[in-house]
Amino acid sequence: MLFGGAATGIFVFGIVMAVLGTLFGLAEMRARLQIDLAQQGNVFLLLFMGILASTLVAGPVINSIGNKIILVASSALVAAGMAGLAYAHSFVGAAIPAVLLGLGGGGLNTSTNVLVSDLYREKRGPMLNLLGIFYGIGALCIPLLAAVIAGHFAIAPQLLICAGLAGACALLFLAMHFPAASAPQGFSWREAMRVAQYPGVLVLGFLLFCQSGNEASISGWTSTYVGATGLSARTATLILAGYWAALMAGRLAVSGLLKIVGKRQLVLASGGGALIGAAILLTNRSEAMLVVGVLVIGLSYAGVFPTALAIAGDTYRKMAGTVFGLLFAIALVGGMSFPWAVGQISQKLGVRFGMVVPLAGAAGICVLAWRILRSDASVELARQSEGGK
């Protein structure tokens, strides 16, 4: 029952992460909001600011009073945000719901992951991976549903359905019984600054900064970019759905790949794949090649974030909680800044130039992953030298 509740909550978070990227690919929504590309980037910035704020607050609150209040309040915030978007007719009308979606989505993400982590201490890895699949299903549903109803129904009813689902989640969580609060120490910025000085922590942090930014840019701007090539809104949303499907399929394959490939090698290879996919997306306008580009990107992105976190967990076991908190904070700053930068560049130079941002992010991942790999090789060589003396 508790895992089912967590799966429902993370499913709603997947919807939150996919909804703006889907909506901005629809001519109907862009015309109703009367926003330019720079303002579109600003809406994404507000979404991720809300996610960052709630992520930092939710952890200590969960530690003090448990998951229930965060899950109920977060679901209610998402419901309000979806309803607000359904009736938005201006930039301000979209900006306020975006903040609400971010606040609610960040709370759902944090609380559901903490809940599953506490419930399944002996099977934490597999169960968190299973939870992530429900996130992918939620994210995939939105562009698929938008593609199905395109030209048949207005977008507002779809958003109101999402609002109703989030509201139902709030009622579900209100009726459920949750474990008592564990009351350990919450995230501390002072402690975070101390662990930031550990060798390699900031390299991993900047790698996740690039990865989070890339994921936010591709999920948020792909439908707009595809629409700018002259393809229909329905095609654009289906191509976006292809990205989410590839990401989910890749996540399912990662655990198997890690049995034959090292974690650091997988991150480097994933960065290279993301670079190739972004280049395909940037240099082609045909529908077939755009599909190839997003599929390569989705499959390549799948292994970066969870594997980098696994590297951090293996390397900094004694301070894993604080290290993870710092890494998530750095990553969310990337999630805020990259899609915003795409909007600013797109407004001045065009969407094609804006999509250089995830290409540069993929290059950054390759450089940082190579550095991690080389650093580990140097440490191993030093150990062998010490052993030979």
List each model region and its residues.
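Extracytoplasmic gate region of multi-pass secondary transporters
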Residues: 20-21, 199-241, 245-249
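Conserved MFS/SLC helix-loop-helix module at the cytosolic interface between two early adjacent transmembrane helices
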Residues: 53-89
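Helix-to-loop junctions at the C-terminal end of transmembrane segments
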Residues: 54-66, 250-262, 346
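Paired small-residue
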Residues: 81, 92-100, 288-296
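Cytoplasmic helix-loop-helix junction between adjacent transmembrane helices
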Residues: 97-133
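Helix-loop-helix hairpin linking two adjacent transmembrane segments in secondary transporters
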Residues: 130-177
